[in-house]
Amino acid sequence: MLKLTDITWLYHHLPMRFSLTVERGEQVAILGPSGAGKSTLLNLIAGFLTPASGLLTIDDVDHTTTPPSRRPVSMLFQENNLFSHLTVAQNIGLGLNPGLKLNAAQQKKMHAIAHQMGIDNLMARLPGELSGGQRQRVALARCLVREQPILLLDEPFSALDPALRQEMLTLVSSSCQQQKMTLLMVSHSVEDAARIATRSVVVADGRIAWQGKTDELLSGKASASALLGIKG
């Protein structure tokens, strides 16, 4: 379970403050206007930002100040951050061993996740030889191979065309269900959120303004629907 209690980040001396509980294995969408604090919330969970105050626990362990490298979290960005001089296999392997010295069990795990992502025939290629969708599959494989209990997505598929974006969302959702991972995804699209998350959180002005069923948001019946430009 992920729990944030009054986690506070000072942005130009103005506090953003978040309290949120997410159960293990739950898939939650984080929505809201541009500049509302959605990515800030994800970066606080990942450890890329250190809160001024508050408490963040994962499975009842305090991770408020745990460095990102030691936090049980993986994060995927729109910019996939693949190393251009490393092959697909090496980029995925970094998720298992930064020195790329993989034992037999790790090699097996790497090839299994590559097969799951549908990129097992691309392992010897460099990122520059791949399409945008293929690069995001590699980046997702690197996240999943780490087998951390929480996966954070910061609009990683927004640059993809609608059909490919839906394909990637389905792949992420099924992979998280298979590995029993908790998923939090920032998105500007309620439609995308509805594809994988039954529950949504709406962030506005550095606060969680609303949380509830994604379908309720999409129907325009929720109090926060207007924040997303949805009319009932």
Curated annotation (Swiss-Prot):
- Binding-site residues, ATP: 32-39
InterPro entries given in the database record: AAA+_ATPase, ABC_SmlMolc_Importer, ABC_transporter-like_ATP-bd, ABC_transporter-like_CS, P-loop_NTPase, Thiamine_ABC_ThiQ
Query: What's the domain of life for this entry?
Result: Bacteria
Residue stretches making up the ABC transporter domain: 2-230
**Topology versus the membrane, per the UniProt entry?**
Peripheral membrane protein
A Pfam family it matches? ABC_tran
Q: Where in the cell is it found?
A: Cell inner membrane
> According to the UniProt entry, what is the EC number of this protein?
7.6.2.15
Q: Is-annotated flag, keyword Transmembrane?
A: no
* SMART domains xrefs: AAA
Question: Which GO terms of the molecular function aspect are on file?
Answer: ABC-type thiamine transporter activity; ATP binding; ATP hydrolysis activity
Q: Answer yes or no on keyword Cell membrane.
A: yes
Catalytic function, reaction form: thiamine(out) + ATP + H2O = thiamine(in) + ADP + phosphate + H(+)
User: Under the cellular component aspect of Gene Ontology, which terms does the record hold?
Assistant: plasma membrane
The alphabetized UniProt keywords are: ATP-binding, Cell inner membrane, Cell membrane, Membrane, Nucleotide-binding, Translocase, Transport
Stated role: Part of the ABC transporter complex ThiBPQ involved in thiamine import. Responsible for energy coupling to the transport system.
Q: What family does this belong to? A: Belongs to the ABC transporter superfamily. Thiamine importer (TC 3.A.1.19.1) family.
Summarize subunit and interaction data from the UniProt record for this chain.
The complex is composed of two ATP-binding proteins (ThiQ), two transmembrane proteins (ThiP) and a solute-binding protein (ThiB).
Name recorded for this polypeptide? Thiamine import ATP-binding protein ThiQ
